[in-house]
From Swiss-Prot:
Protein name, as recorded: Snaclec Bfon18
Gene Ontology cellular-component terms listed: extracellular region
Source organism phylogeny: Eukaryota, Metazoa, Chordata, Craniata, Vertebrata
Protein species of origin: Bothrops fonsecai
Keyword entries, A-Z: Disulfide bond, Hemostasis impairing toxin, Secreted, Toxin
Protein purpose: Interferes with one step of hemostasis (modulation of platelet aggregation, or coagulation cascade, for example).
Molecular function terms, GO-annotated: toxin activity
Family, similarity comment: Belongs to the snaclec family.
Domain C-type lectin: 1-15
Signal peptide: none
């Protein structure tokens, strides 16, 4: 999973 302030999208994390 991603850090709580990041969001998952198409298999990676973004801010």
């Amino acid at each position: 999973d991603c850090p709580s302030d990041w969001s998952p999208y198409e298999g990676h994390c973004y801010k």
